């Protein structure tokens, strides 16, 4: 009996050793991913070269997730850790500080992709109570097929760089999957290009990139949860809003309860449908063979319930106030004198980043968001605006140093007043005027700052005008406004800041 027990113990030990050495035995990479889209895209690229594990399963809200000690240990034991973006997995930056970078390779799936500003999302959804949740920047790029392709490409390139011996396999797998995503993109483009109604109403404000890339407009509403009926007061507001805007469908992230669907139908005359944000797949979905592409196809079918019907543009419940000081709307009495210390610091021109293509994503967003100009037209407009040969400006409380063509020129300045200018669009701006006390200041004799502020405050960036003739001559310059940001920011960081404001 003792011999049998010893044999069993030995076999168990061998089994445990074999399990712990599985990576070495099968030669596969051990990759840990955060939530479903990241898992799916990574798995498609890695194929048989890796054991790809999903950290955040169905029933757990990715926005709210905090890794357990066991989950952290799992990541620390991986070859590669893949996440989407710190604006989605907000816990990742702290985790990265603890990782052994030599042992665990990290991939941020969004790479250098710029994100749109975030905002307050749905109230009462995801069990968030009354406040909803907030992203500084909107991370939901995977819900646009054309951007999903970019995520897959970045995962492919990152894995290939980290494991060059497997590059050929990664590229082959990615190409096959990207072909499917391109078909999905084509289906969305063709299915939505002739939309009769371009606005859709959703309880989960996750579809902004999808809307932007396919010519639609997402209108998010608050105070609705798929499994709870709204209060009588909220229902009355919704009823008025739905009827005023002739809304046919409200989209939820999961099937609304029958009670809620009946209430909305009876009281507001609106139907409900599902737009799945694909943050997870349920066990039932997985067993049914659902995946990213099949769910996105269902999302398209659901969207067409709205876009195939004629209807007026749907306005948000709460209109955004665009007449702000930053946009050029203010009272004269609010304009106050400022000192050079508001601009103190070391600044870099943004013009080189326009030239090297860093800002191309910014111009693409502007074209899609406004519809006023194409991406190429925006780039031409900003090329004229940003153009300058002054690469750096270093400012103290009373001096400015201009770095031009490798030469440094430094002068002392005094404040000489302010000027309110009215623009063609009807909005206004304030220029704060400075004059060099040095007789040899030349083209830097007269300087004007415009930073979208009208009273003393530390500038985050500024547009500058300078010349050697007079302040009055500079007032006439409206097309060239060299722009400067702190010199410790990368071009990528500046581009993201531009989208945030």
Swiss-Prot record:
Residues 125-136 have a biased composition (Basic and acidic residues). Residues 1-18 form the signal peptide. Coiled coil: none annotated. Residues 116-136 are annotated as: Disordered. One of its GO terms (cellular component) is plasma membrane. PROSITE patterns: PROKAR_LIPOPROTEIN (PS51257). One of its GO terms (biological process) is zinc ion transport. A lipid is attached at residue 19 (S-diacylglycerol cysteine). Zn(2+) binds at residues 63, 140, 204, 279. Keywords: Cell membrane, Competence, Ion transport, Lipoprotein, Membrane, Palmitate, Signal, Transport, Zinc, Zinc transport. Pfam families: ZinT, ZnuA. It is a lipid-anchor. SUPFAM superfamilies: Helical backbone' metal receptor, Lipocalins. InterPro entries: AdhesinB (IPR006129), Bact_metal-bind_prot9 (IPR050492), Calycin (IPR012674), Lipoprotein_PsaA-like (IPR006128), ZinT_dom (IPR015304), ZnuA-like (IPR006127). Residues 120-136 are annotated as: His-rich loop. GO terms for molecular function: zinc ion binding. A lipid is attached at residue 19 (N-palmitoyl cysteine). It is found in: Cell membrane. Belongs to the bacterial solute-binding protein 9 family. The His-rich loop facilitates the closure of the zinc binding site and is required for zinc acquisition. Part of the ATP-binding cassette (ABC) transport system AdcABC involved in zinc import. Binds zinc with high affinity and specificity and delivers it to the membrane permease for translocation into the cytoplasm. Required for transformability. This is Zinc-binding lipoprotein AdcA. It comes from Streptococcus pneumoniae (strain ATCC BAA-255 / R6). The gene is adcA.
């Amino acid at each position: 009996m003792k011999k049998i027990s010893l044999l069993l113990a030995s076999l168990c030990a061998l089994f445990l050793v074999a399990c712990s050495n599985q990576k070495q035995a099968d030669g596969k990479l051990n990759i840990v991913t955060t939530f479903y889209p990241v898992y799916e895209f990574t798995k498609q690229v890695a194929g048989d070269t890796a054991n790809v594990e999903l950290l955040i399963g169905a029933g757990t809200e990715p926005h709210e997730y905090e890794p357990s000690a066991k989950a952290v240990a799992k990541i620390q034991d991986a070859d590669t850790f893949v996440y989407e973006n710190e604006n989605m997995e907000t816990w990742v930056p702290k985790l990265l500080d603890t990782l052994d970078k030599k042992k665990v390779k990290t991939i941020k799936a969004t790479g250098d992709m710029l994100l749109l500003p975030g905002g307050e999302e749905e109230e009462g959804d995801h069990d968030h109570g009354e406040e909803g949740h907030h992203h500084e920047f909107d991370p939901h790029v995977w819900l646009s097929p054309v951007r999903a392709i970019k995520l897959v490409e970045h995962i492919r390139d990152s894995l290939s760089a980290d494991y060059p011996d497997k590059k050929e396999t990664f590229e082959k797998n990615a190409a096959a999957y990207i072909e499917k995503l391109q078909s999905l993109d084509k289906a969305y483009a063709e299915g939505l290009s002739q939309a009769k109604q371009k606005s859709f109403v959703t309880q989960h404000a996750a579809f902004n990139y999808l809307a932007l890339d396919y010519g639609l407009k997402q209108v998010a509403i608050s105070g609705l949860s798929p499994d709870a009926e709204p209060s009588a007061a909220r229902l009355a507001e919704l009823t008025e809003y739905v009827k005023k805007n002739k809304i046919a469908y409200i989209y939820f992230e999961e099937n609304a309860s029958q009670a809620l669907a009946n209430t909305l139908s009876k009281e507001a005359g609106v139907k409900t449908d599902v737009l799945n944000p694909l943050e997870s797949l349920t066990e039932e979905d997985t067993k049914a063979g659902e995946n990213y592409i099949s769910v996105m196809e269902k999302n398209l079918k659901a969207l067409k319930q709205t876009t195939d019907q004629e209807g007026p543009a749907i306005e948000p419940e709460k209109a955004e106030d665009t007449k702000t000081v930053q946009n050029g709307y203010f009272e004269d009495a609010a304009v106050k004198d400022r000192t050079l210390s508001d601009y103190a610091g070391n600044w870099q021109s943004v013009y080189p980043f326009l030239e090297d293509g860093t800002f191309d994503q910014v111009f693409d967003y502007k074209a899609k968001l406004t519809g006023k100009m194409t991406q190429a037209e925006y780039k031409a407009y900003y090329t004229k605006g940003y153009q300058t040969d002054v690469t750096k400006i270093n400012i103290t409380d009373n001096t400015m140093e201009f770095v031009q063509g490798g030469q440094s020129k430094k002068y002392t300045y005094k404040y000489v007043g302010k000027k309110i200018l009215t623009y063609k669009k009807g909005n206004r701006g304030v220029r704060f005027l400075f004059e060099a006390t040095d007789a040899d200041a030349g083209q830097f004799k007269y300087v004007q700052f415009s930073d979208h502020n009208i009273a003393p405050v530390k500038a985050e960036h500024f547009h500058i005008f300078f010349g050697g003739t007079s302040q009055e001559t500079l007032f006439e310059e409206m097309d060239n406004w060299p722009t400067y940001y702190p010199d410790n920011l990368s071009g990528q960081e500046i581009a993201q800041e531009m989208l945030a404001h």
